[in-house]
Amino acid sequence: FSVAAAGASMLNGIGVTEDGTIYASNTRDPQRVYRITADGDASVFIDGSPLMAPNGVAIDNDGNIVVVNIGNNHVMTFAPSGELLQTEYAVEAGNDGVIVTEDGTKYVSSVRFGSISRIRPGEEAEVIAQGIPSAASICYDSVQNQIIIPMNNNNALGILPLD
């Protein structure tokens, strides 16, 4: 089946919770994150500020929703109620993808600057890779402990082993 999100203009990043709830960013106006239940009911989860061209969406280990903006370097964690719990900051802006690993570390890709920021719990962000052309959405390979990064303009994938 398919689900229409009323008012959406560019659904982009997607995160899915254990119960099957989907959170999808709308990067263009109106800048929103939608919630779509496992039954297919769509509603607006976050609308407007602090979103600034929201893109990547991930679910953390506590079931909270993590969203990154292209328009700034904010890495925002929202409770399922919609409450903004925390804002962290990637090293660079222009962020496209985000993942959260088992230990709570967040990895953020900057499509604008071609870098990967790592944010360990309670620590400042640090760049762990740079010079990645069009570092877009990312995914985590838990078997190999590595990040896979699509390099859109190069029609290639970057693979970043983690320590």
For each predicted feature, which ranges?
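Beta-rich, blade/repeat-based domains predominating
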Residues: A5-S25, P30, G48-N64, V68-N73, ...
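Short, structured loop/turn "capping" segments at alpha-beta junctions
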Residues: D29-Q31, G40-S43, M52, T77, ...
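Short loop/turn segments that connect beta-strands within beta-propeller blades
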Residues: I36-D41, F78-E83, I119-E124, P161-D163
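A short beta-strand motif characteristic of beta-propeller blades
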Residues: F1-A4, D41-G48, E83-Y89, E123-A129
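Short, basic/aromatic-enriched C-terminal tail that caps enzymatic domains
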Residues: I148-D163
